[in-house]
Amino acid sequence: VFEIAPSAK
């Protein structure tokens, strides 16, 4: 989870 888009998926 970051701001809007989770770039960990």
Curated annotation (Swiss-Prot):
Transmembrane segments: none annotated. The keyword Acyltransferase does not apply. It comes from the Eukaryota. GO terms for molecular function: metal ion binding. Keywords: Heme, Iron, Metal-binding. Signal peptide: none annotated. Belongs to the plant globin family. May not function as an oxygen storage or transport protein, but might act as an oxygen sensor or play a role in electron transfer, possibly to a bound oxygen molecule. This is Non-symbiotic hemoglobin. It comes from Pseudotsuga menziesii.
